Amino acid sequence: MYLGIDVGTSAVKALLIDENSVTLAEADVPLRVSSPKPFWSEQNPTAWWDATLRAIDDLHRQNPSAIAATRAIGLSGQMHGATLLGADDKPLRPAILWNDGRATRECAELDAALPDLGQRAGVATMSGMTAPKLIWLQKHEPDVFAKIKTILLPKDYIRFCLSGDKATEMSDAAGTLWLDEQSRSWNQSAIEACGLTRDQLPHLVEGSDVTGTLRATLADRWDMRNDVIIAGGGGDAATGGIGVGAVSHGDGFISLGTSSQIFVASDKYRPKPEELLHSFAHAIPDHWFQMAVLLNGASCLKWAADLLGEADITALLNRVEAQHDAPSDILFLPYLNGERTPHNNPHARGVFFGLGSDTDRETMVQAVLEGVGFALRDAKSRLHKAGTQCDLPGVIGGGARSRYWIKMIADILGKPLARYEGATKGPAFGAARLARLALTKEPVADVCVKPAIEEVIEPDLTRHDAYRPRFAKFQRIYAALSDEFTPD
């Protein structure tokens, strides 16, 4: 049995699979995000650990014999989160998350100090990355900065709690700006530019490597054997790719999770920072990927549903679909948490345009869904400019539950999309696969097979044409407002 753990933004998810990749038990424990100031986004690392314990306890209750037979654990997690440990190996402050926008000035300073950083790190300097956050801390919380013994990423804090090992792997390290993507090693000049030393970073492994074994006290808690290994794992984008078999050149998918991504696997390192793409090491050796990253995805739908008092999202979507016979009369910029591709603007915010006294909640929700679709089309254009293609991307993540939304996105993109069986398993499933690879050393192709395609959803080209002028207006509205998003 193989256990996958995903430390997400909204929840910790744990999933147990057998030798045939059949899910035997799964559990979700919700998390909360704190925003103590505008553009700040933080979580307490101890909340991740508490949620992880509760999730595995739940698996143990569901299927005690299967959890007892666990042989390996794989880890996945939200990327970029600066998790700082002091001399006692306890967190010094809340972790600063991927969608935190406080370190914009520090990005400019880092670019000035290291003009070639984008080519080596595979991405333009962005405030959500780990490195500029440390420069911000050095300036604004010098007492905390001076006490830093170790910097970990979210899933790697859970690794430390599980096994006592301080390690990370290539796909998650990629999001720090401290990794040299081509050589898959730490970039000493980037580390020093942040006032840090190599000793403050964890050692690097591949996602399919073993980093340690489960602590005896935890093995006893869950009635596990005493030699359960911990695999390197991956950042959530890479583990999502492992989960849907996106490991060969050109394999890809669209993720509709809290954030959204268009992910395409690559056989080489192909940096395109000028297009605001992420060109990162994959979670398996000698593989990379290119990715357009949107900071907002299915979270926009949840935000709208919560705001409108709609507890049953499925029923809400059914009502929206029933009245949807044309593009919405209103537009929505889905930048509730800023945006990366194609704007690199952490200060951008959500906008409804065209509201009238006759606007109903279904029309507003349709606009929200279309806004995410338009943002995906905007981001996809950057992949196209980079020469990156994916013939039939599947859609994964929580948003993939809605066939209606997938069909809408296919219409907006003018591109067929695949619905996978088990598309909502997500990164935890990929983490479990990496656990298996670490234990068995099987060929990647034998383990990371693609899921069965439940349906290929073809675009309605008439509706695609109807969306063209709406998309153009969507772009014009952002361009008109972009300067207004800058804080006073």
Where are these regions (language model features)?
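N-terminal glycine/serine-rich phosphate-binding loop of ATP-dependent small-molecule kinases
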Residues: 1-94, 119, 147, 219-220, ...
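Short, conserved phosphate/pyrophosphate- and ester-handling motifs at nucleotide-, phospho-/glycolipid
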Residues: 44, 100, 236
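Extracytoplasmic/secreted proteins and extracellular or luminal domains
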Residues: 63-66, 197, 386
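Active-site core segments that coordinate phosphate-bearing ligands/cofactors
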Residues: 3-4, 104, 110-124, 129, ...
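Short beta-strand-loop/turn "lid" adjacent to the catalytic site in phosphate-handling enzymes
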Residues: 63-98, 123-128, 159-180, 203-206, ...
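Short secondary-structure junction motifs
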Residues: 67-70, 199, 327, 390
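A conserved helix-loop-beta module that forms one wall/lid of the active-site cleft
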Residues: 194-206
